[in-house]
Amino acid sequence: MTTLRLDSLKANVGARRRKMRKGRGIAAGQGASCGFGMRGQKSRSGRPTRPGFEGGQMPLYRRVPKLKHFTTVNSKEFTVVNVAALNELKAGSTINLDTLVKNGVVTSPKYPLKVLGNGELKVKLTIQAAAFTATARSKIEAAGGTCEILD
């Protein structure tokens, strides 16, 4: 058995195709028009046209306005509630997304809960949510409540 050396490597039979020689006579199979069709811009030298070229028509990338921002990829969506909306709830209770849906504060439990700090909180609550803003956390703790972050 021969040793494996770089100068003795060969491709498997049928793994490599021969290069197509274009424009070398009709008998070669790709003579005359070389597989580029009859006439027109796509059959001329210097083909093909550049990407985005639409035959002289104003291309799409120039027709569409330049926008000033990009949407965040994989952005997190939350069900948001302000601390002012929590004043209607019973003092001393534990509040989570299911409790808010039952009490009609939030309509849908589709996304995790995030508590925002708009308004004033007058009741002491233990709130379980996925996220809190800094102002919401300070207002809840100032009212004597606690914030628990859920995963």
Curated annotation (Swiss-Prot):
One CC-aspect GO term: cytosolic large ribosomal subunit
Domain of life of the source: Bacteria
The coiled-coil regions, if any, are none
Q: Does the keyword Ribosomal protein apply?
A: yes
Q: Where is this region: Disordered?
A: 37-57
Please explain the role this protein plays, according to its UniProt record: Binds to the 23S rRNA.
Q: In its UniProt entry, what is this protein called?
A: Large ribosomal subunit protein uL15
Q: Which organism is it from?
A: Prochlorococcus marinus (strain MIT 9313)
